[in-house]
Amino acid sequence: MSSYRIQGATGEWEVVIGLEVHAQVVSNAKLFSGASAAFGAEPNQSVSLVDAAMPGMLPVPNEECIRQAVKTGMALGAEINRWSRFDRKNYFYADLPQGYQISQLYHPLVGEGTITIDADEKAGIAEARTIGVERLHVEQDAGKLMHDQHPTRSYVDLNRSGVALMEIVSKPDMRSPSEAGAYLRKLRSILRYVGSCDGNMEEGSMRADVNVSVRKAGDPFGTRTETKNVNSIRFVMAAIESEANRQVDVIEGGGKIVQETRLYDPDRNETRSMRSKEDAHDYRYFPDPDLLPLELSEEFVAQCRAELPELPDAKRARYEGELGLPAYNAAVLTSDVETARWFEALLDAAGKPGAEVARAASNWLISDLFGALNRLGKAIDESPVSPRQGAELLALVADGTLSGTLAKQVFEIMLETGDDPARIVEERGLKQTSDTGAIEAVIAEVMAANADKVAEYRGGKDKLFGFFVGQTMKAMGGKANPGVVNELLKKTLG
């Protein structure tokens, strides 16, 4: 359990957090129409008559959206409901042309599941925790109001209207902003592995409604508020902290928390009231008369299960077990599906090597490649160096052609030019030398130039050995084999 507490005037307060995540389904078409679901089109260019709620237009469920939701439910270890139904959620807003949203209140497609978050001592998560998922249902997204096009008017863009969403509702099991952040990162990772949502919060394809309440430890749950449409993990964590502190101040000041919907203002780092929170009866839910219940066949469910990829937890266990990777490396490499794919392509290019080479490959990817990509501001799928080239570079180190220092030089040239490492080594004369005669000659020069330090070393100052190694390597332009240098220095220095 989290040790996170808010220190108030009357003592410590525990924070109770639940998240409702809206994840846009990856599909070519919308949930009930054939209009494109792609992001970025000009306003109102991806709108069918169904999306615009023209009279007489009937919705037809998109099987691919249902398939993606079922696979996501399976990835969460959740119960798949073979029978589910669509309901109408009735409310008026300018970006909702139908006057209602087609959702699933009473009989969702997916039942209870779980998400496991890892221990992270730096973030205050002392041990791995399992967070309950209450349900997953599919629903339509609304359109978008545009307030920056005219000084006195707002415009409506219906491109997003009718796009399929999965609403993934957690149980109120989280107790700190860090746990909420870890939950969202893990959920986003799972969605990307499945391929059901790209998890791009900046484009709005994944957003979170944040439910927060506070209580004294052991007390019943307090009254919760819901902060709507938070579009980054960092903002979710900040909104939780801000809202929890606000609630403590209100209660300790003699006030009461009102169940309401709030908005988070990242510029001021505070939440503000948007409207009183509605209950289900306020929306007058009833079964959608235009849609039959969804009944999934055994064959359809089995096909969805067969299409599931290896998920991050299973892949991580395999990396640790079969490849012998350290737990940290395995966690980093499996946290993002693109990173895992790149690493596996690297291993394939290296001829599916044993544990020693796999470990070296993971270290190189995490330290050298990640460092370079961060410096360049690129994602791993935009890497200037391919997995094949990475495998060739590692092979040149393994066979002694390159030292670690030379390999770093070659890698920098690869980043700049895109050339293969073997060609760079050949053209620039960067091959490591193990010529004992040449190395002995340089060692003799280094010792002659540093006779005082030789005397100190032979007098017992063993730490000076590293100085002689460094001077020798420097004199040879980093091309000497470090192992041979060490061996010859030990023999020469005595």
Swiss-Prot record:
Kindly state which keywords UniProt assigns to this record, in alphabetical order.
ATP-binding, Ligase, Nucleotide-binding, Protein biosynthesis
Q: What does this protein do?
A: Allows the formation of correctly charged Asn-tRNA(Asn) or Gln-tRNA(Gln) through the transamidation of misacylated Asp-tRNA(Asn) or Glu-tRNA(Gln) in organisms which lack either or both of asparaginyl-tRNA or glutaminyl-tRNA synthetases. The reaction takes place in the presence of glutamine and ATP through an activated phospho-Asp-tRNA(Asn) or phospho-Glu-tRNA(Gln).
What's the name of the protein?
Answer: Aspartyl/glutamyl-tRNA(Asn/Gln) amidotransferase subunit B
- According to its UniProt record, this protein's enzyme class is ligase
Q: Which InterPro entries match?
A: Asn/Gln-tRNA_amidoTrfase_suB/E, Asn/Gln-tRNA_Trfase_suB/E_cat, Asn/Gln_amidotransferase, Asn/Gln_tRNA_amidoTrase-B-like, GatB, GatB_C_1, GatB_Yqey_C_2, Gln-tRNA_amidoTrfase_suB_CS
Which GO terms fall under biological process for this protein? glutaminyl-tRNAGln biosynthesis via transamidation; translation
User: Where does the signal peptide begin and end?
Assistant: none
Q: Quaternary arrangement and interactors, per the entry?
A: Heterotrimer of A, B and C subunits.
* The keyword Chaperone belongs to this UniProt entry's keyword annotation: no
GO MF = asparaginyl-tRNA synthase (glutamine-hydrolyzing) activity; ATP binding; glutaminyl-tRNA synthase (glutamine-hydrolyzing) activity
Q: What is the lineage of its organism?
A: Bacteria, Pseudomonadati, Pseudomonadota, Alphaproteobacteria, Sphingomonadales
User: Which domain of life, per UniProt?
Assistant: Bacteria
Q: Name one Pfam family in it.
A: GatB_N
- E.C. numbers: 6.3.5.-
Q: Does the keyword rRNA-binding apply?
A: no
Enzymatic reactions: L-glutamyl-tRNA(Gln) + L-glutamine + ATP + H2O = L-glutaminyl-tRNA(Gln) + L-glutamate + ADP + phosphate + H(+); L-aspartyl-tRNA(Asn) + L-glutamine + ATP + H2O = L-asparaginyl-tRNA(Asn) + L-glutamate + ADP + phosphate + 2 H(+)
The Swiss-Prot or TrEMBL record describes its family as follows: Belongs to the GatB/GatE family. GatB subfamily.
